[in-house]
């Protein structure tokens, strides 16, 4: 009898738990907005790398892509995109083309939780590589 009572209480607890409505405030909404990606097209970027990056992003219907320049970054384009991609080319030239203020704008953009991808020289640009002109995102 004791075992039957315990099993009945366990069954009852399970039924009550399954019938409690979900708390919708804890569920995360899935965005239906496209992910807006800016591909850096500044001095030092290899045109083929820029074109191929843009073409690759266009394959995903849930993404919108545009090319951005140093002037665009200075004019706050980062406020209207979700991620930035720095493609391959000459990292030193890209570094110099961005300048100190735009480099800081990119750091601030990333610190807000926005996305950043560096491809080839762009990856070095984001790195902390000794003896290389880089933004030093890691410190």
PLM feature spans:
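Short boundary motifs at domain starts and secondary-structure transition points
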Residues: 25-32, 75-76
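An acidic, glycine-rich "communication" segment
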Residues: 127-139
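Helical hinge/lid and interdomain linker segments adjacent to catalytic or ligand-binding clefts
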Residues: 46-129
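C-terminal motif of bacterial Sec signal peptides marking the signal peptidase cleavage site
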Residues: 14-17
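Bacterial lipoprotein signal-peptidase II cleavage site
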Residues: 19-25
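Sec-dependent signal peptide recognition
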Residues: 2-9
């Amino acid at each position: 009898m004791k075992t039957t009572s315990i099993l009945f209480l366990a069954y009852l607890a399970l039924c009550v738990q399954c019938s409690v409505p979900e708390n919708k405030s804890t569920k995360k909404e899935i965005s239906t907005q496209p992910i807006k990606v800016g591909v850096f097209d500044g001095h030092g970027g290899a045109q083929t790398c820029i074109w191929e990056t843009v073409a690759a992003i266009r394959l995903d219907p849930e993404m919108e892509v545009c090319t951005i320049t140093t002037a665009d970054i200075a004019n706050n384009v980062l406020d209207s995109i979700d991620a930035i991609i720095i493609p391959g080319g000459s990292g030193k030239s890209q570094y110099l083309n961005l300048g100190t203020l735009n480099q800081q704008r990119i750091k601030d953009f990333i610190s807000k939780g926005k996305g950043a991808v560096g491809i080839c020289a762009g990856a070095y640009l984001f790195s902390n590589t000794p003896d290389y002109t880089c933004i030093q995102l890691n410190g």
